[in-house]
Swiss-Prot record:
Native source organism of the sequence: Halothermothrix orenii (strain H 168 / OCM 544 / DSM 9562)
Keywords, in A-Z order: ATP-binding, Cytoplasm, Kinase, Magnesium, Metal-binding, Nucleotide-binding, Transferase
SUPFAM superfamilies: Actin-like ATPase domain
Binding residue positions for Mg(2+): 7, 384
Annotated compartments: Cytoplasm
Sites annotated Transition state stabilizer: 180, 241
Function: Catalyzes the formation of acetyl phosphate from acetate and ATP. Can also catalyze the reverse reaction.
Top-rank lineage group of the source organism: Bacteria
EC category name: transferase
Protein name: Acetate kinase
Similarity comment: family membership: Belongs to the acetokinase family.
GO CC annotation: cytoplasm
Length: 398
């Protein structure tokens, strides 16, 4: 079975084609600058052959058609014809309360995704565009929606209801949803395999640390709490997002800086986090370099970032009544050696012992705790596309 996985953004389109027999990637690539000047497609096949196609890509329709054509290209392609694709799996950011698992796309499902799009206005409309274009260009080929929020729908009510007037939840669906669900699910399952124990017997804390960052408490394979909330703004300090703050700061800033609500929202989402505190960059590597050079604001930004991660690990250990493993994943989690060391070294109260030699690796699946560490620590590169492909294959086969 061959599955095409698509992640449609506002001006970009990422894709991977999987052969599910051995779960291998046949081809992958990205369409960049859709609807903008100097648009292009970057493509690589399983033979390691790469190509860049620079052409006018005015919309997603042209972008997806270009992907289909490139997958069938005589030199760089891996398919003889489009009919070899058995199904298409789409990343959809927000499923609200309507979707607790991945689902086969129908007209009714599209309508329901539209209904929750106000909860993810920067993502869902573009995800829907990808779905509609595929329906038009690939009629008859089944499509599956895989939601970032679905994995967290197992959270208990006490974890997802905010202490606001309850009618806001009833009328508007204001509650904690959580994100990065496919990533948290994948690395938790991998951790269980590396421990050679059933996932159902484990308490795992997964730390997805990238430009967007979240932590999840996973008890017996189910998400019981997560740091992101109604939107991806809550929780950890991120590249440009503030994470947890006192809500009263918002009207205070509006008054002091003479800003309207959209301007404050822009500050919290795009001008805060590592970037806002350091004044340098949203990229943790740049901030770390500046900190080493003696930049105090960069040092403060990193201290806050690490402190918030440790705070959530401690909280989620309490939520689950213990923890068997902590997993680091995503760009920072997989590659920031000193960041991991600093976080893990202060988890001694959990019986954690760091293996510094093992930790001295980037982007590699590895246990970084010692053999006698009571709580295991892993670095596991995430693979959200594979989760989408697996879910798509499972749903289409059933």
């Amino acid at each position: 079975m061959k599955i095409l996985v698509l992640n449609s953004g506002s001006s970009s389109l990422k894709y991977q084609l999987f052969d599910m027999e051995k779960e291998t990637v046949m081809a992958k690539g990205v369409v960049q600058r859709i609807g903008i000047d100097n648009s292009f497609l970057e493509h690589e096949n399983y033979r390691g052959e790469e190509t860049t196609i620079e052409t006018d890509i005015p919309d997603h329709n042209r972008g997806i058609q270009l992907v289909i054509d490139t997958l069938q290209d005589e030199k760089y392609g891996v398919l003889n014809n489009m009919e070899e694709i058995d199904a298409v799996g789409h990343r959809v950011v927000h499923g609200g309360e309507k979707f607790a698992e991945s689902t086969l796309i129908t007209d009714e499902v599209i309508k329901q995704i539209e209904e929750v799009s106000e909860l993810a206005p920067l993502h869902n409309p573009h995800n829907l565009t990808g779905i509609r274009v595929c329906s038009k260009l690939m009629p008859g080929i089944p499509q599956v929606a895989v939601f970032d929020t679905a994995f967290h729908q197992t959270m208990p009510r006490k974890a997802y209801v905010y202490a606001l007037p309850y009618e806001y939840y009833e009328k508007y669906g204001i509650r904690r949803y959580g994100f990065h669900g496919t990533s948290h699910k994948y690395v938790a399952e991998r951790a269980a395999r590396l421990m050679d124990k059933p996932l159902e017997e484990l308490k795992i804390i997964t730390c997805h640390l990238g430009n967007g960052a979240s932590v999840a408490a996973i008890d017996a394979g189910k998400s019981v709490d997560t740091s992101m909330g109604l939107t991806p703004l809550e929780g950890l300090v991120m590249g440009t997002r503030c994470g947890d703050i006192d809500p009263a700061i918002i009207p205070f800033i509006m008054d002091k800086e003479n800003l309207d609500i959209k301007e404050v929202d822009n500050v919290l989402n795009k001008k805060s986090g590592l970037y806002g505190v350091s004044g340098i960059s949203n990229d943790s590597r740049d901030v770390e370099e500046a900190s080493k050079d003696g930049n105090e604001r960069a040092t403060i930004a990193l201290e806050i970032f690490k402190y918030r991660v440790k705070k959530y690990i401690g909280a989620y250990t309490a939520v689950m009544g213990g923890v068997d493993a902590v997993v680091f994943t995503a760009g920072i989690g997989e590659n920031a050696i000193e960041m991991r060391e600093s976080i893990v070294e202060e988890l001694g109260f959990l019986g954690v012992k760091l293996d510094r030699d093992a930790n001295n690796n980037r982007g590699k699946e590895i246990e970084i705790s010692t053999k006698d560490s009571r709580t295991k620590i892993f670095v596991i590169p995430t693979n959200e596309e594979l989760v989408i492909a697996r879910d798509t294959a499972r749903i289409v086969e059933s």
